[in-house]
Amino acid sequence: MLFPTARRTGLAALAALALVPAAACSGSSAPAEAEPASAEVTAEDLSGEFERLESEFDARLGVYAVDTGTGEEVFHRADERFGYASTHKAFTAALVLGQNTPEELEEVVTYTEEDLVDYSPITEQHVDTGMTLLEVADAAVRHSDNTAANLLFEELGGPEGFEEDMREIGDDVISADRIETELNEVPPGETRDTSTPRAMAGSLDAFVLGDVLEEGPRDVLTEMLLNNTTGDELIRAGVPEDWRVGDKTGGGSHGSRNDIAVVWPPEDDPIVIAVMSTREQEGAEFDNALVSGATEVVVEALAP
């Protein structure tokens, strides 16, 4: 797929990309595991690097990355569960974009002051006027607006509907149970609102690089991810400056910090990366350097 070389932040540009009629999400393209690698980088190869980061940051770290050109993988605790926090917004937005026509995406969604939840920097400015469904999706992805995320959940039939839709695209791992902001409370041992790095990377791959979405909504989603405003210190900070990064971040209780991304090296095929982390202590804070450090290990392995 070819993507625009310049970043465009206006919703007018996003709307223009949406002119291709949207189709309901299909189950024909599963985000399943990457194709078998010819020269797989095993967990053992890099376990020392990732364990060093876990020790340095007193955290449990999960990583899965795949070079989509070679099938080469990097992984560490890739099948362990972590709270996904706000990274789900990439998927809820993708599903809403895929299930609505361009005309439906321009319909205004209304809400009240009572609907606002913590961290809603965009929706709190538009209570009186409402926002189009496209603007709601943009607020959720690019600004991680929590009220916008709940409006997307509502469009999908709540967490249950979201999970059902994810099953349709082939993700049989994600567990969706609560809305914002309760879904961010994921203590050790909790399985609600969790997934694994491998599954998160697979679903992002399916939405952005696969054929789960028609070209129009897929391009809109990709532009939103490329213009994300919350990820400068995470995966973006761990890759070379000339790489293009489309990502969605997340943070929650117990020092949880996540980032999922598709990254485009200048001369190579995209790499899909999911980094998830958490700590044992209830009041622990996250450290973005853990995510960027894990990304640096991935980059060194896949693009030395």
What feature does the model see in each segment?
Residues 42-78, 263, 273:
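A short, well-structured edge-of-sheet supersecondary motif
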Residues 71, 82-114, 140, 273:
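Active-site SXXK
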Residues 20-24:
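C-terminal motif of bacterial Sec signal peptides marking the signal peptidase cleavage site
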